[in-house]
């Protein structure tokens, strides 16, 4: 059994799908046991830079801002639910291209102690054995990674 307090900062990665949310109860239990901070991490992937000018010209910038605001509200809603359970929770929203790379950079830069993520997400199967985000994160971070399958939730 792990010593209490081993994990101080725990990240759960979310992509807005119900699949990714299935990792939350596992992360919350570990955070509660360790009295750790739980960080809800979402990477927002904007349109590719080569299309950004076209999007702005087409008047889509407002729609992108609305989408970003919806994501923020989604994360804040989850944070508030978890705070109601007496957990120390914060939200981290990163904007950029290269989801796995951005997740790894954040985890390594912030000295995260544990990563909890689902093997399924918005793209369907995470292709764990074939180079999906979960595998890239496992290979790119120093922290242990707990993978949650949908049927484990």
Language model regions located:
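Short, hinge-like loop/turn segments at secondary-structure boundaries
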Residues: 55-59, 108-110, 133-134
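Structural beta-alpha unit
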Residues: 1-5, 80-115, 152-153
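Short, well-ordered secondary-structure micro-motifs
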Residues: 23, 50-53, 101-104, 127-129
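Glycine-rich, Arg-bearing micro-motifs that act as flexible, cationic patches
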Residues: 114-136
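Short, structured motif recognition centered on aromatic/hydrophobic residues
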Residues: 11-12, 30, 38-40, 74-75, ...
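Small/aliphatic-rich secondary-structure junction motif
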Residues: 2-58, 81-83, 87-90, 140, ...
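A short acidic, glycine-rich active-site loop
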Residues: 58-73
């Amino acid at each position: 059994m792990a010593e209490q307090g081993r994990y101080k900062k725990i990240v759960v990665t979310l992509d807005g799908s119900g699949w990714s949310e299935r990792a939350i109860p596992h992360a919350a239990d570990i955070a509660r046991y360790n009295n750790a901070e739980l960080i809800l991490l979402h990477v927002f992937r904007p349109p590719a830079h080569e299309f950004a000018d076209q999007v702005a010209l087409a008047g889509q910038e407002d729609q992108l801002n609305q989408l970003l605001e919806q994501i923020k509200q989604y994360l804040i809603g989850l944070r508030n639910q978890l705070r109601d359970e007496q957990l120390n929770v914060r939200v981290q929203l990163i904007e950029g291209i290269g989801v796995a790379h951005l997740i790894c950079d954040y985890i390594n830069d912030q000295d995260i102690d544990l990563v909890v993520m689902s093997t399924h997400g918005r793209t369907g199967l995470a292709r764990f054995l074939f180079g999906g985000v979960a595998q890239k994160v496992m290979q790119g971070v120093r922290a242990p990674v707990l993978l949650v399958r949908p049927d484990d939730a």
